Amino acid sequence: MSQKRKIIFVIVSLYGGGAEKSLINLLHEFDYEKYEVDLLLFKKEGLFLNQVPEQVNLLEIPHDLDLMYRNSYKGAIRRISDLQYVLTRFLGTGLVKVLPHKSVRARRQVRWKKFYRNAIRPFDREYDIAVAYLECEPTYYVLDKIRAGRKYVWVHNDYDSTGLDSKYDLPYFRKADAVVTISDKCANILRERFPEAAEKVWCIPNITTSKYIRELAADEPDEPFREDRFKILSIGRLSEQKGFDMAIKAANLLKKRGYRFEWIIIGEGELKNELTEQINRYGLNDDVRLVGQKSNPYPYMRCCDFLAQTSRYEGKSVVLDEAKILSKPILATQYPTVHDQLDDKIGLIVGMNPEAIADGMERLFLHPELLEGMQRELEQHDFGNTHEISCYYELFESDVSGENE
């Protein structure tokens, strides 16, 4: 029997994002007869932490890395030398905040380059394959700190919308054996932005498991929709990317037009207080509910009339694929990659503003036959794609001499 290949996946945490969920799906489909799999998190936290398969070795976080990313230092300082990491973190984080015209992620790039890269020690294990399963800091850690025969980095979004500085990422992408993204549109954007690394770009879709999702959807929601209203569902991090500020403004317009609806938003994030204040300001407490993260959102998806995605940008949305598996019509804003996943047979694409979102929803409210037709079309297909696991093995077992088709 041939020796198992050693592979490590690196990601910040397992909070409820699309990249994190797709990693869990991938790990559940992995061939553990061929691979010995380690998982390294910068923070051992998140909604999906208890869904890591038992065959995966969830590593202890190296002490220096832990000090750079942990949320609290209570009980973490073991020795005087630890203070250098705490100082580096606070100095780096504080100084990059004053940089003009820099996004949060671009500031993290500078923080890694000027502060973290020199402070964090190399990882003490060696692998056949190392995978940075998210852009930005996991990528830099894998390429700077892990010894491996092959190194692959994932970009889970339309790169132009990430806020990252391409000049900083170029030398890293040159060092990587492959740069993997999740849709044709995202791949083309990477090739245009990084022509020097264009031959390294691979497109491999996220894994979505239809059987598992349908089984979970059979449960009942713990905070169910009311039956006397249109039922709208959105799922995503409460961040600027997901556009829930536009969603709440659209809800305000719909209420003014006299419609009765309940819009449940599943997710947590940095804009929770701001969005809650917005809901209160518009008097929408009876119409829009922020219910937090749910380890099983699929009963809500099964019970809704349609899924609403109000994003400003996406890579290839895991949530849209999951909605399609449950035969749920979709209303989505016209972000650059939306046509990779959606057409007018199964959903409605609207402009990226509150008025267009409200108008699209009003159309669905007034014409239930549209929703019925979309649902019938969705029911004719199986949108699961566990067979795509072969693309991952093709990458991991290839000589990475060029792009995949």
Regions found by a protein language model. Give the residues of each.
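Donor nucleotide-sugar binding/catalytic pocket of nucleotide-sugar-dependent glycosyltransferases
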Residues: 150-156, 160, 174-216
